[in-house]
């Protein structure tokens, strides 16, 4: 783990914490009870605490300084170990190093919620049952493009398909391959193509996203059998599984790389984004955006719409274009019904 420099504000915060008396010593640390400042990575985030891994691979449960907000899995942090445990807590996180990126989603109660930080790729996990939803894949891809994090589309439970059904699925995935996205069909149950997933995951730090029931926990069980992540039963009625992961956590993979597992998300909303951001989330639109006749073109029936003309010429996939408008409409409907605030 390479050393990283703290900002001046973070250095002042640490120095201030060193000289500040703690009001409740029975609940928090006094300065003389703490060791030297060291660097670590957050591997698990709990409601009031976080587990920090040291450069030596040791993990300590830590309190958070009151001045810190929104510590998440993947954060590189400055922390201090206590001379002894205090009510089961081993140290204190003092500061968060600047993030290279973060994955966020809107929350109906908390505004914009950061899920994880410092991610090298997002693994979008989908499944053939109850149905393969390209609209949901497109929704996640907009998030990936907005966060500027590379994406890999993984289709799980491929063993449940016949040969003809597999060919049809490959045609659907070709829509994404033709615009530069990588895709992978596999089965966590049979192990088909799991070695290919291993190679993708060895690239760096990855995070699984996808609706409940697509088999994220089953994939983790295959990748890390000793973890034995809980596997939720898929509802016979809805086909959607129950949430089985209760805390976000970072795992080190034996073949190299890290994997962040976060609670399943049934709806990854886009209502925190502006329509222009969703438009920019469609990478194949980029070559024609700005060439429409009207600057405020909505890319519907507007005269001289370059995006629609590209669809009619077959240069932009019609299904993706239809999903784009569905996402915009869904965003507008939800936006009018919900109020949210961004975290300061």
From Swiss-Prot:
GO biological process: ribosomal small subunit biogenesis
One annotated GO molecular function: rRNA binding
Entry protein name: Small ribosomal subunit biogenesis GTPase RsgA
Species lineage: Bacteria, Pseudomonadati, Pseudomonadota, Gammaproteobacteria, Pasteurellales
Binding-site residues, GTP: 156-159, 210-218
Function as written in the Swiss-Prot or TrEMBL entry: One of several proteins that assist in the late maturation steps of the functional core of the 30S ribosomal subunit. Helps release RbfA from mature subunits. May play a role in the assembly of ribosomal proteins into the subunit. Circularly permuted GTPase that catalyzes slow GTP hydrolysis, GTPase activity is stimulated by the 30S ribosomal subunit.
CDD domains, per database record: YjeQ_EngC
Positions that bind Zn(2+): 292, 297, 299, 305
Similarity comment: Belongs to the TRAFAC class YlqF/YawG GTPase family. RsgA subfamily.
CP-type G domain location: 100-268
GO CC aspect terms: cytoplasm
Cofactor(s) for this UniProt protein: Zn(2+)
